[in-house]
Design a protein with these regions (language model features):
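N-terminal acidic, glycine/proline-rich low-complexity segments
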Residues: 2-308
Length: 308
């Protein structure tokens, strides 16, 4: 949900850093926040990190969002340099420039090796639920559920609050029916990075103030200035999902026992241990969180490969 907060942007930053290292290949970025601005912002990020050809899929469902920070993607996408040229070039000018997320999912998944794709969902669940319900098309004779079963290795989701069964977490609350559908029907293993994990592992403001002397302009820092007007400590919610998807636990996380996570009609998430369950969630203790934050600080402040 690019634009509702800046941890989405840092999560994409981390994916590009992993791609720089050859540890990940980014097939596409799917938006589940409406509007052309978020699509433009994702494309300008991909371009800034040296991968302008990464496909961007537009949202297929309007989420139920209330409140939130200013929509910084639109502002950053419109920024100009001293000569009046786009500060962060991008080619998207209208929503129709982007395929819808389900069509893009089906096109890309059909071309991948079986059980080779990891999907990292750090926003709402509308695209994933719609993918499950999609039918055979020109890209694949398989239904959406069959296509996911064949091509997807696993799903990592930033959603919910495991330690507080009464908490209504934003990503869940913004599209409860779709989130219920994903947790009840998704055919692969799901690993959840819950709200409390990122809330208790915060990227320090000092990182933003002190670690980016290598660049005059940075699209994520500019987004933060628009969204907050200042640098401050901030939770690493979405970033934890990307880190786990690429590195696994790696000393930063502990994986729960298998179980089943259900989403209530009110938007709460409940976990029940079950040896046959396909859901797990991430935890971290004090020492793990310290290492986690140090690692993320090094990653996000590192100069991208194409800027060296």
């Amino acid at each position: 949900d690019m634009g509702n907060d800046v941890d989405d942007a840092w999560a994409l930053d981390m994916l590009h850093k992993y791609a720089d290292e050859g540890r990940a290949r980014i097939l596409a970025v799917m938006l589940n926040k409406e509007g052309v601005g978020p699509c433009q912002y994702v494309e300008l990020l991909n371009t800034w990190y040296g991968r302008p050809k990464i496909a961007v899929g537009r949202a297929v469902k309007k989420p139920n969002i209330t409140g939130g920070i200013p929509c910084f993607p639109d502002t950053v996408a419109a920024m100009k340099d001293a000569s009046g040229n786009p500060l962060y070039p991008h080619r998207i000018s209208r929503l129709s420039d982007c395929p819808d997320a389900v069509t893009l999912y089906r096109r890309l998944l059909s071309k991948q090796k079986d059980h080779s794709v990891t999907i990292v969902s750090v926003g709402f669940s509308g695209n994933l639920a719609a993918l499950l319900h999609s039918e055979a098309d020109q890209y694949s004779p398989l239904s959406g559920r069959e296509l996911v079963t064949r091509k997807v290795k696993g799903l990592v989701v930033m959603a919910g609050h495991i330690s507080d069964p009464h908490y209504r977490e934003f990503n869940v609350l913004s599209d409860i029916p779709s989130c219920q559908e994903v947790f009840s029907s998704w055919p692969t293993d799901i690993v959840v990075t819950p709200f409390e994990l990122g809330q208790n592992a915060q990227l320090p403001a000092a990182c933003l103030r002190e670690d980016f002397g290598w660049t005059e302009h940075h699209p994520v820092l500019d987004g933060i200035k628009v969204a907050w007007g200042e640098y401050r400590d901030y939770p690493t919610w979405d970033m934890t999902g990307v880190l786990y998807a690429v590195e696994g636990c790696a000393g930063y996380f502990t994986l729960s026992a298998p179980g089943t996570i259900t989403v209530t009609p009110e938007g709460c998430t409940h976990y029940v241990a079950d040896s046959q369950g396909r859901h797990r969630y991430l935890m971290s203790d004090h020492n793990q969180r310290k290492l986690l934050v140090e690692h993320m600080r090094r990653m996000v402040s590192r100069k991208p490969k194409n800027k060296n």
